[in-house]
Protein backbone atom coordinates (compact mmCIF):
# COMPACT_ATOMS: atom_id res chain seq x y z
CA UNK A 1 0.00 0.00 0.00
CA UNK A 2 1.17 3.54 -0.63
CA UNK A 3 2.23 5.46 2.46
CA UNK A 4 0.00 8.34 1.33
CA UNK A 5 -3.03 6.02 1.48
CA UNK A 6 -2.10 4.78 4.97
CA UNK A 7 -1.68 8.41 6.05
CA UNK A 8 -5.10 9.34 4.65
CA UNK A 9 -6.82 6.44 6.45
CA UNK A 10 -5.06 7.30 9.73
CA UNK A 11 -6.05 10.97 9.45
CA UNK A 12 -9.65 9.97 8.72
CA UNK A 13 -9.55 7.89 11.93
CA UNK A 14 -8.39 10.97 13.84
CA UNK A 15 -4.78 9.88 14.50
CA UNK A 16 -2.79 13.06 15.16
CA UNK A 17 0.52 11.21 14.71
CA UNK A 18 -0.30 10.88 11.00
CA UNK A 19 0.24 14.63 10.55
CA UNK A 20 3.95 13.79 10.65
CA UNK A 21 3.57 11.55 7.61
CA UNK A 22 1.82 14.06 5.35
CA UNK A 23 3.49 14.41 1.95
CA UNK A 24 5.92 11.52 2.41
CA UNK A 25 6.13 9.52 -0.83
CA UNK A 26 6.67 5.79 -1.28
CA UNK A 27 5.21 2.57 0.02
CA UNK A 28 4.41 1.52 3.59
CA UNK A 29 7.31 -0.98 3.59
CA UNK A 30 9.84 1.74 2.88
CA UNK A 31 8.21 4.03 5.42
CA UNK A 32 8.56 1.34 8.09
CA UNK A 33 12.16 0.56 7.13
CA UNK A 34 13.24 4.20 7.51
CA UNK A 35 10.73 5.13 10.24
CA UNK A 36 9.31 7.90 8.06
CA UNK A 37 7.79 10.99 9.58
CA UNK A 38 8.65 14.34 11.08
CA UNK A 39 8.69 16.10 14.45
CA UNK A 40 4.88 15.76 14.42
CA UNK A 41 5.06 11.97 14.44
CA UNK A 42 6.86 8.97 12.94
CA UNK A 43 5.30 5.75 11.69
CA UNK A 44 7.23 3.80 14.34
CA UNK A 45 5.19 5.56 17.04
CA UNK A 46 2.08 3.58 16.11
CA UNK A 47 3.53 0.21 15.02
CA UNK A 48 2.35 -2.69 17.15
CA UNK A 49 4.14 -5.39 15.15
CA UNK A 50 5.54 -6.13 11.69
CA UNK A 51 5.60 -9.37 9.72
CA UNK A 52 8.48 -9.92 7.33
CA UNK A 53 10.22 -12.64 5.38
CA UNK A 54 13.93 -13.01 6.06
CA UNK A 55 16.08 -15.77 4.56
CA UNK A 56 12.94 -17.65 3.52
CA UNK A 57 11.42 -17.61 7.01
CA UNK A 58 8.36 -15.64 8.07
CA UNK A 59 8.94 -13.75 11.30
CA UNK A 60 6.85 -11.32 13.33
CA UNK A 61 8.57 -8.58 15.30
CA UNK A 62 6.88 -6.64 18.08
CA UNK A 63 7.32 -2.88 18.43
CA UNK A 64 10.43 -3.06 20.62
CA UNK A 65 12.09 -5.62 18.34
CA UNK A 66 11.63 -3.26 15.37
CA UNK A 67 14.12 -0.86 17.01
CA UNK A 68 12.64 2.34 15.63
CA UNK A 69 14.82 5.46 15.92
CA UNK A 70 15.36 8.60 13.85
CA UNK A 71 15.23 7.46 10.21
CA UNK A 72 16.04 3.85 10.98
CA UNK A 73 14.76 0.51 12.19
CA UNK A 74 16.16 -2.86 13.17
CA UNK A 75 14.73 -5.08 10.43
CA UNK A 76 17.05 -7.74 8.98
CA UNK A 77 19.01 -6.23 6.07
CA UNK A 78 17.32 -8.15 3.26
CA UNK A 79 13.93 -8.61 4.91
CA UNK A 80 10.77 -8.13 2.86
CA UNK A 81 8.10 -6.46 4.98
CA UNK A 82 4.75 -8.08 4.22
CA UNK A 83 2.33 -6.88 6.89
CA UNK A 84 2.06 -4.44 9.75
CA UNK A 85 -0.34 -3.78 12.60
CA UNK A 86 -0.77 -0.16 13.65
CA UNK A 87 -2.31 0.98 16.91
CA UNK A 88 -2.77 4.54 18.14
CA UNK A 89 -2.00 4.13 21.85
CA UNK A 90 0.01 7.26 22.59
CA UNK A 91 -1.23 9.61 19.88
CA UNK A 92 -4.06 12.05 20.43
CA UNK A 93 -7.29 11.22 18.64
CA UNK A 94 -8.82 14.36 17.16
CA UNK A 95 -11.76 15.29 14.99
CA UNK A 96 -10.79 14.01 11.53
CA UNK A 97 -12.11 17.13 9.79
CA UNK A 98 -9.72 19.32 11.80
CA UNK A 99 -6.83 16.97 11.04
CA UNK A 100 -7.56 17.07 7.31
CA UNK A 101 -7.52 20.89 7.37
CA UNK A 102 -4.18 20.82 9.20
CA UNK A 103 -2.82 18.19 6.77
CA UNK A 104 -3.73 20.38 3.80
CA UNK A 105 -1.92 23.34 5.38
CA UNK A 106 1.17 21.17 5.91
CA UNK A 107 1.07 20.00 2.29
CA UNK A 108 0.80 23.59 1.10
CA UNK A 109 3.83 24.60 3.20
CA UNK A 110 5.79 21.62 1.83
CA UNK A 111 4.99 22.59 -1.75
CA UNK A 112 6.34 26.09 -1.08
CA UNK A 113 9.52 24.96 0.73
CA UNK A 114 10.52 21.92 -1.35
CA UNK A 115 11.50 21.63 -5.02
CA UNK A 116 8.97 20.60 -7.63
CA UNK A 117 11.50 18.78 -9.84
CA UNK A 118 12.03 15.03 -9.57
CA UNK A 119 14.23 14.00 -6.66
CA UNK A 120 14.80 11.19 -4.18
CA UNK A 121 13.53 13.36 -1.33
CA UNK A 122 15.80 14.44 1.51
CA UNK A 123 19.28 13.14 0.75
CA UNK A 124 20.78 13.39 4.24
CA UNK A 125 19.52 12.89 7.78
CA UNK A 126 19.44 15.98 9.97
CA UNK A 127 22.40 15.91 12.37
CA UNK A 128 21.55 16.24 16.04
CA UNK A 129 20.49 19.80 16.86
CA UNK A 130 20.78 21.10 13.30
CA UNK A 131 19.42 20.80 9.77
CA UNK A 132 21.25 19.24 6.84
CA UNK A 133 19.73 21.79 4.46
CA UNK A 134 21.07 24.73 6.50
CA UNK A 135 24.59 23.27 6.65
CA UNK A 136 24.62 22.58 2.90
CA UNK A 137 23.34 26.10 2.20
CA UNK A 138 26.00 27.66 4.46
CA UNK A 139 28.67 25.57 2.71
CA UNK A 140 27.58 27.17 -0.60
CA UNK A 141 26.08 23.92 -1.81
CA UNK A 142 22.92 25.29 -3.46
CA UNK A 143 23.14 25.12 -7.23
CA UNK A 144 26.13 22.74 -7.35
CA UNK A 145 25.78 20.41 -10.30
CA UNK A 146 27.17 17.11 -11.57
CA UNK A 147 25.78 15.97 -14.91
CA UNK A 148 22.00 16.26 -14.72
CA UNK A 149 21.92 16.33 -10.90
CA UNK A 150 21.76 19.64 -9.04
CA UNK A 151 21.53 20.67 -5.39
CA UNK A 152 18.14 22.38 -5.28
CA UNK A 153 18.10 26.16 -5.02
CA UNK A 154 14.80 25.87 -3.13
CA UNK A 155 15.93 23.41 -0.41
CA UNK A 156 19.58 22.40 -0.20
CA UNK A 157 18.88 18.90 1.20
CA UNK A 158 17.31 17.87 -2.11
CA UNK A 159 19.23 16.84 -5.22
CA UNK A 160 16.98 17.35 -8.22
CA UNK A 161 17.08 15.93 -11.73
CA UNK A 162 17.64 18.81 -14.16
CA UNK A 163 17.45 16.37 -17.06
CA UNK A 164 19.20 13.08 -17.71
CA UNK A 165 20.66 12.70 -14.22
CA UNK A 166 22.04 9.26 -13.42
CA UNK A 167 22.30 7.61 -10.01
CA UNK A 168 26.07 8.09 -10.32
CA UNK A 169 25.57 11.85 -10.84
CA UNK A 170 23.47 12.04 -7.67
CA UNK A 171 25.91 10.01 -5.55
CA UNK A 172 28.93 11.96 -6.85
CA UNK A 173 27.23 15.29 -6.14
CA UNK A 174 26.09 14.19 -2.69
CA UNK A 175 29.65 13.11 -1.85
CA UNK A 176 30.97 16.56 -2.87
CA UNK A 177 28.33 18.15 -0.62
CA UNK A 178 29.30 15.86 2.29
CA UNK A 179 32.96 16.85 1.89
CA UNK A 180 32.14 20.58 1.82
CA UNK A 181 30.01 20.37 4.95
CA UNK A 182 32.62 18.30 6.79
CA UNK A 183 35.40 20.76 5.89
CA UNK A 184 33.38 23.78 7.01
CA UNK A 185 31.53 22.44 10.06
CA UNK A 186 33.32 19.20 10.99
CA UNK A 187 29.96 17.43 10.62
CA UNK A 188 29.60 14.21 8.64
CA UNK A 189 26.19 14.16 6.95
CA UNK A 190 24.65 10.70 7.05
CA UNK A 191 22.71 9.38 4.05
CA UNK A 192 18.95 9.24 4.47
CA UNK A 193 18.47 7.67 1.04
CA UNK A 194 19.28 3.97 0.85
CA UNK A 195 21.64 3.36 -2.05
CA UNK A 196 21.55 0.03 -3.83
CA UNK A 197 24.13 -0.93 -6.45
CA UNK A 198 27.61 0.04 -7.56
CA UNK A 199 28.16 3.75 -8.25
CA UNK A 200 31.89 3.68 -9.02
Named regions from a protein language model:
Residues 16, 46, 64-66:
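Short beta-strand or tight-loop elements
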Residues 24-31, 38, 122, 148, ...:
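Gly/Ser/Thr-rich helix-start
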Residues 19-26, 33, 117, 144:
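Short glycine- and Lys/Arg-enriched binding-loop motifs that mark or flank ligand-binding interfaces
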Residues 53-175, 179-200:
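Phosphate/pyrophosphate- and phosphate-bearing ligand-binding catalytic cores of soluble enzymes
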Amino acid sequence: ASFARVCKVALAAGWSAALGWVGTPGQIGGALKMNAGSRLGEIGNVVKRVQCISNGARIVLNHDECGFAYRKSNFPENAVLTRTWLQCDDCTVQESTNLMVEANKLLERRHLSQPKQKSAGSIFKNPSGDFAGRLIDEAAGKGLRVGGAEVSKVHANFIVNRGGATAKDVVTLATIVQERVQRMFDVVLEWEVKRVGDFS
